[in-house]
Amino acid sequence: MKTKIDVESIMQLARDCAQVNSMISTAIPTMDGWCTSEKALTLAGLVLQMKPKLCLEIGTYAGRSFLPILWALKENGGGKAIGIDPYDAKVSSEQEFPGNSEWWATLDHGLIEKKFHAFLKAFGVAQYAEIIKKKSSDVDFPNEIDIAHIDGGHCEGGFLDIQRITPKMRIRGVVVLDDIQWVGGAVLRGIDHLLENGYVECYRNVEQNWNIMQRG
C-alpha cells in the first residue's frame, strides 16, 4: 500500500516562507554534509505543515538537515527537535563498511561538532534543539515523535535505529530515511520492517536515495 505525499507542495510551503527559504538557499550549500536543498525544503515543509511538537534526527553531523527542521520550528513558534550524534570517529567508523570506515576514522569530528554548535548559536535556534552526544543505540527514544529523520549509520546499526523508532512514532507520524539503497541492504530491511508494522511509503526519491514513510 502506498499513500502519496505531495512533496512539491510541501517544498513550496518552505519556499513561501521567506526566512526559511533564504536560510536553505544561502546557508545549506556552505555546510559540511550531503543533504540536498530539495530534501532540506522537504524537511522544513513537513514541519511547517504538520506543526510538530517533537522531531528527532539520528546523525546530526554539521546540521545540514537538522537546521532546516529548527528554522521551521522557529517559524511555527514552538516545538522541539532532538539531535543525536556521538561525534566520535571510532563509533562512526565501526558503523560503516571498509572504505567508508577509513574515511570516517580520519574525519575531525570535533571540528564538525564545533561548527554545528556555532550554527545553532548564529541562527538563533538553540532553544528549539536538544542535542544528545551519544550513540543512538544508547539513547532511549521518547514516545509520540511527530517527525523522525534517520541518517546515522547505514549498516546493521541503521536497521536497529529504524526498528527501535518504529513504535515510538505517533499515529500519522512521518519517518524520513536517508541512503535507502546503501550497501548491505540494512535500510531496505528497515523499510520492510516499517511496512510490516503499519507504515506506508508515501514518497521515494530514487535519484537522491531517500524516502518518506508514515505510520497508519
What residues fall within each predicted segment?
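S-adenosylmethionine/decaboxylated-SAM
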Residues: P29, L41-G216
